[in-house]
Amino acid sequence: MKVALASRNPSKVKAVEEALRILNINGTVEAVDPPPGIPPEPMGLEATVNGAVVRARHALSSIKDSTYGIGIEAGVLMLSAFNVNFDVTVAAVIDRKGLITLGLSPAFMIPPAFMRELMTGKELNDVVEKYYGVPNAGKGIGFIGLLSRGLIKRINLNTEAVYMALLPRMPWNKDLYELSD
């Protein structure tokens, strides 16, 4: 099976490979450039899901012999009632019938100082670099890797989002999710 991924980010490519391995899916990942026009820091769950779905559709249409297209998008989940914001990763998996399944990673709180900068239009990667002095952390251990001092890495969050999105497609779950071949 060939899986198309709308990202060349090494963390995302490795995450999809790892999710396939965990679920015992024999497949290869082919990375393509993401589609143009995706906002760098989606605000809200719907915007983040939409970004993942747009990426997944683009991946599927870019690799004609792929079984699935996968999009992975990190964004900000806002809980205004508690004045708290979370970083969350959403994975979308689309097949040739157009069926989309979604998965989310664990989410972690974004520090208020970081959030203030994001609200001015800055990208999280730039804010992380300013505070930690690590350029392009998103292509490596990620913001979570820096916050957790390496205990949790971005690849872990990406992997969990992807296998959560693939779980409904597993043979033992298809009936539960009312999916047909």
Curated annotation (Swiss-Prot):
Co-factor(s): Mg(2+); Mn(2+)
EC number(s) stated in the UniProt entry for this protein: 3.6.1.73
GO biological process, one term: thiamine metabolic process
Enzyme class: hydrolase
NCBIfam families tied to this protein: inosine/xanthosine triphosphatase (TIGR00258)
Family matches, as HAMAP family: Non_canon_purine_NTPase_YjjX (MF_00648)
Record-given protein name: Probable inosine/xanthosine triphosphatase
